[in-house]
Amino acid sequence: MSDIIDSILSTLKKGRIFRSRDLLLPDYIPEALPHREDQIRKLVEILAPITRSEKPSNVFIYGLTGTGKTAVTRFVLSNLQRKFPSKFTFIYINTRQNDTPYRILADVLEALGIRVPFTGLSTAELFKRFVKRLNTFQTIVLITLDEIDALVKKHGDDILYRLTRINYDLSTSKVSVIGITNDVKMVENLDPRVKSSLGEEEIIFPPYNAEQLEDILKQRSKIALNEGVISEEVIKLCAALAARDHGDARRALDLLRVSGEIAEREGRDLITADDVNRARIELERDRVYEVISTLPFHSKLVLISIVLGLNSNSTLTTGEVYDIYIKLAGKLGVESITQRRVSDIINELDMVGIITARVVNRGRYGKTKEISLAVSKDIVIKSIKESDERIGSLWSR
């Protein structure tokens, strides 16, 4: 067994592709962002009041995945903070990862030096502590909420409303919010007051074209790859493939990185067009199939309950999903889980992009979730039937 390890390590030592592969990862912010000069300029102009200790407008930033929204925002804010360290506090939160109002407020408080328990307090109490903390000193707090479409889909827009109105309760400090979203249509579903407050200023990020992606890859390959390991033709191929996928720079960088990893694994010192095509297949491997196949049993049963329920409905509520789930558990002779746990599973399926669970307000009936599939029904059925014999047996009954 150690011979296998030695052989792999020996091959990897021969590969001299990367100078620093970390510079191809999404969280790396380069010193220059090609073809985003207009967006950088506009964001700096909007935020300029902080240099005079004045509150800037709230900003809504739109654009598809991989169009540079997060990179530009962090680039501008980190540069402003370096130039004006005492003028403002910058807090960045990805709301897909910190996906509850409680966690968001807890992270904001912790960034301001206030520790809070992981659970146990109400959001109202957290807001109260937030206001109290801000009223103890004088600053501008810029809160960047990335991927807010994920937050709004799960929990509605109440936290956005409260954050954009919090300045009415502040005497010395002020708060501005930068909202970043991949889903332009999400804005249509916001409370008009939230839409008005958060969208005081807007910046649109268009997709990159193939030539622009090529420039980005050339810039990044110079610092991330060793000299001479990739040709201009191979860079053009990576750019062209990513341009087909709505001009996604993240996709282009992933293609470059995985192509390099393939060449390096095989002990070569040159990335070829074949490596790029193999990387494309590797990246496009059916993510949905793999995610569903590895779900726990009850998560699969909840998912199949949603599929069956949507045969006769365009959307489902959590209660309707739970009713179907109970019947299926009975048919299979397994002990059912609680409705609360089913609700948690629905949130988890939404988080990984298998379903969409949108919070809607039904007036006097309160808030509920409207659940629908975000992927092909056929893929769901195929992956569950092939990965779980017990649930697969439902189709033979």
Swiss-Prot record:
Stored InterPro entries: AAA+_ATPase, AAA_22, Cdc6_C, Cdc6_lid, ORC1/CDC6, Orc1/Cdc6_arc, P-loop_NTPase, WH-like_DNA-bd_sf
UniProt record, GO biological process: DNA replication
Mind listing the UniProt keywords for this protein, alphabetically? ATP-binding, DNA replication, Nucleotide-binding
Summarize where ATP binds, as residue positions: T67, G68, K69, T70, A71, Y208, R220
Q: Which Gene3D superfamilies match?
A: 1.10.8.60, P-loop containing nucleotide triphosphate hydrolases (3.40.50.300), Winged helix-like DNA-binding domain superfamily/Winged helix DNA-binding domain (1.10.10.10)
SUPFAM superfamilies named in the record: P-loop containing nucleoside triphosphate hydrolases, Winged helix' DNA-binding domain
Q: Report which superkingdom the organism of origin falls in.
A: Archaea
Under the GO molecular function aspect, what terms does this record hold? Answer: ATP binding; ATP hydrolysis activity
Annotated function: Involved in regulation of DNA replication.
Q: Which family does it belong to?
A: Belongs to the CDC6/cdc18 family.
Query: What name does this protein carry?
Result: ORC1-type DNA replication protein 1
Give the originating organism: Sulfolobus acidocaldarius (strain ATCC 33909 / DSM 639 / JCM 8929 / NBRC 15157 / NCIMB 11770)
